């Protein structure tokens, strides 16, 4: 069993998140987030460190670059049982991130709105291609040995059930299960983007 101590939360849809955040907070899990998600967490009364404070780098390019930083991805990808990784984490002051919760930009829904002849433009659709979120999903899923990845709001109740049973601890089998779901989400998302570009 591995304990969840720090959670990075970066979601588009906030509905259904509050119950999960409450349980994590009750278990003493520390939150790390950006933008609207950070404001949502703080609005619930929980402390939340800004990713910008961790990286000492602001969100740039109209929000296109927020979490893409070695201090974030190093904290997710670092192998906890690898001495070299641990030495570099200490050298560069990289915190361990044990849980990543992501809900991607609604690309397919935006395309569907455009297909219904709404005022959605091609640029609107392109801006809904998630970069940071999909990168977080893949990084956390790759390191499922140490990290829990919740890749969509559909998985919020799954993690909540585990937390209610075990506290802030997960098994390797549970982390692998989440990783499998995560690569499914990633594959589906990229397939939708490929299909749209193929039709454009």
Where are these regions (language model features)?
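Internal alpha/beta core interface subdomains
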Residues: 2-5, 94-200
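Short, basic, glycine/proline-bearing loop/turn elements
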Residues: 3-7, 70-77, 121-122
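Glycine-rich nucleotide/cofactor/substrate-binding loop typically near the N-terminus or early
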Residues: 36-107
């Amino acid at each position: 069993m591995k304990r969840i101590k720090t959670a990075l939360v970066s979601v588009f849809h906030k509905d259904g998140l509050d119950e999960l955040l409450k349980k994590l907070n009750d278990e003493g899990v520390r939150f790390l987030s950006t933008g609207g998600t950070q404001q949502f967490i703080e609005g619930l009364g929980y402390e939340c460190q800004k990713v910008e404070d961790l990286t000492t780098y602001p969100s740039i390019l109209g929000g296109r670059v927020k979490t893409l930083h070695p201090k974030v991805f190093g904290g997710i990808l670092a192998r906890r049982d690898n001495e070299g990784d641990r030495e570099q984490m200490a050298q560069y002051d990289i915190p361990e991130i044990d849980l990543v919760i992501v809900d991607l930009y609604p690309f397919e829904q935006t395309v569907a709105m455009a297909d219904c002849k709404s005022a959605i433009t091609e640029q609107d659709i392109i801006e809904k291609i998630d970069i940071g979120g999909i990168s977080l999903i893949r990084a956390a899923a790759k390191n499922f040995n140490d990290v829990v990845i919740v890749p969509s709001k559909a998985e919020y109740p799954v993690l909540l059930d585990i937390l209610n049973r075990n506290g802030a601890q997960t098994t390797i089998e549970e982390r692998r299960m989440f990783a499998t779901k995560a690569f499914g989400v990633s594959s589906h998302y990229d397939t939708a983007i490929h299909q749209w570009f193929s039709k454009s």
